[in-house]
Amino acid sequence: MKIMKLAGAVAIFSLFLTACNDKAEKLKVGVISGPEHKVMEVAAKIAKEKYNRDVELVVFTDYATPNAALDKGDLDLNAFQHKPYLDNQIQEKGYKLVPVGNTFVYPIAAYSKKIKSLAELKDGDTIAVPNDPTNLARALILLEKQDLIKLRADAGLKATSVDIIENPRKLVIQEIEAPLLPRTLDDVAFSIINTTYAGQNGLTPTKDGIFVEDKDSPYVNLIVARENNQHSEAVKDLVKAYQTEEVYNKANEEFKGAMIKGW
């Protein structure tokens, strides 16, 4: 009888330790520098206050490193990418990563220092687009919606320049690394830039874009975990902390309304 009581006490104590360890688990979350970092700071604060979760934010300046760090185990989560980009990374790199929650749609837009509308665009003008596969497709789809090009019907979210079957304005389309696109504005008719790098250069789609991606975009950004930690209570708490009005209000402040709630 004493042995059974002792075993029961040990089991209860073990469960207590497990619960305590889970609550004490510190999350390392990868984010991109700039406004997205500031938005995640609010989520981290809520995670601590509401769920007693300590969150360390690891800041990156590129789109390649956060997934490699997460897959390696140097991070517990990251929050910077949409699903088409994640799917492409998984296919190319073999990462064991999964989305665990939505954040916002940050619409891409065309920006220009040379023209105020497409009516001023000239035949043969040079334009700039992102060169990474997913955001290149996103930019090409946006160009097609403006009737500037036509893509193959089956190109979909993996469209590349070889899928352009009509270019009636004979536009020269330059593919540039995303962080460098704002620097091209002095040299091209317009550049298609995502919200992160536009915002870092004082640009917002609703105010400065000559045309903008709409609310029906499939490119909602994600909170991403590894397959082996996706069901962690700590991960779930961070997602709940992010998907709050406080975070939405901070994003609205940082992005000046240039985002759409994804949850």
UniProtKB/Swiss-Prot annotation:
It is a lipid-anchor. A lipid is attached at C20 (N-palmitoyl cysteine). This is Outer membrane lipoprotein 3. Gene3D superfamilies: Periplasmic binding protein-like II. GO terms for cellular component: cell outer membrane. Keywords: Cell outer membrane, Lipoprotein, Membrane, Palmitate, Signal. Pfam families: Lipoprotein_9. Residues 1-19 form the signal peptide.
